[in-house]
Regions:
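Short, amphipathic alpha-helical "recognition" segments used to contact nucleic acids or chromatin
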Residues: 77-90
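Generic hydrophobic, aliphatic-rich segments that mediate packing or membrane embedding
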Residues: 46-49, 53, 71, 79, ...
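Short, flexible loop/turn motifs enriched in small residues
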Residues: 47, 77-79, 187-191
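Charged, surface-exposed interaction regions in soluble eukaryotic proteins
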Residues: 59-75, 86, 105
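Alpha-helix N-cap/N′ positions at the starts of helices
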Residues: 34, 75-78
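Charged, often Cys/His-bearing segments associated with DNA-binding zinc-finger transcription factors
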Residues: 1-69, 123
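Short, well-ordered secondary-structure "scaffold" segments embedded in the functional core
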Residues: 92-287
Length: 287
């Protein structure tokens, strides 16, 4: 027994000094990214746009210096915003935590902080045009897009369409009908994301509350966008593709191929104005 006790008292080789990770400065980290042009690939925006966004959110994302005095120090607001943007771009939480040497648990907390800051910022909120001044401003953008010589789309304020956003198929405990999320058109599982944007790719209405099997017309209705569009004062309207029903406030293309000259011309300019929603989706999903 004494021998056994003595064995427990034998100390192992002395442990080395604890290595403390240092947190890299934001400006130091992004310098090579700016120089080689990969900053936008990483954060989905130019450095100047990042600074502008950070200036809007600074009071909400900057760290508490008193709470960050120990261990690796406080996480600077730029790192919080950067991690949030990387996560929103589809990167895993490990990639979001990589730069500032954050533990994954810390990274989750900082991404949540960044998301809350974005959602609480009034200047970033999706806003539907209501006043005459706002409507005229939106219409001016589409007049500019419609033609260099003759502004055909004089009173258009938006263009709408649907996008399938891929998700992991829910189980029966999460949704009573998991198969409803399968889109036969796209052959994948997702949610139907309805969006209306202006001529400058700014989203003015968005909703993602219907399963992927829902057609665009029904998803548009369940989002409440049909009532929203119909509430537009005359003569303003929105553009949509053939999946939506035609009304005085929702202009869709003429169906079929055997169209007369006037109908064909209308479809051309209607399609020209509707390009902005496709480009908006492209901006959303590109990396």
């Amino acid at each position: 027994m004494a021998t056994l006790a003595a064995g427990f008292l034998i100390l192992p080789t002395r442990r080395g000094e604890c290595t403390q990770r240092s947190r890299q400065e934001w400006e130091e980290m992004i310098k090579p990214l700016v120089e080689d042009g990969t900053f936008k690939t990483r954060y989905r925006m130019e450095p100047g746009e990042f600074k502008q966004l950070y200036s809007m959110l600074r009071n909400r994302v900057d760290g508490d210096v008193k709470k960050g005095l120990g261990h690796n120090g406080t996480v600077a607001g730029e790192w919080v915003l950067g991690a949030t943007l990387r996560w929103l771009a589809g990167h895993g939480i490990s990639a979001a935590a990589d730069g500032p040497n954050m533990a994954e648990s810390t990274a989750y907390a900082k991404v949540k902080k960044g998301l809350d800051a974005i959602n609480q910022c009034g200047r970033l909120r999706i806003k539907w045009p209501k006043t005459e001044r706002e409507l005229r401003k939106k219409a001016k953008g589409f007049r500019r897009r419609s033609s260099q010589l003759v502004p055909v789309l004089k009173h258009c304020v938006g263009a709408g369409d649907g996008l399938l956003v891929r998700i992991k198929k829910p189980n029966v405990n999460e949704h009573p009908c998991p198969d409803r999320f399968f889109s036969g058109h796209k052959m994948t599982v997702g949610m139907n994301y309805q969006v209306i944007c202006d001529a400058d790719y700014i989203v003015i209405a968005a909703c993602c509350n219907t399963p992927g099997s829902t057609n665009d017309r029904q998803a548009f209705k369940e989002a409440g966008f049909d009532n929203l569009v119909e509430s537009l004062p005359a003569p303003y309207y929105v553009l949509g593709d053939a999946a939506y029903g035609a009304t005085n406030k929702m202009l869709v293309p003429y169906p079929g191929c055997n169209l007369d000259a006037d109908q064909d011309a209308f479809n051309f300019f209607q399609s020209q104005g509707r390009m902005c929603i496709e480009q908006t989706f492209g901006i959303m999903v590109s990396e």
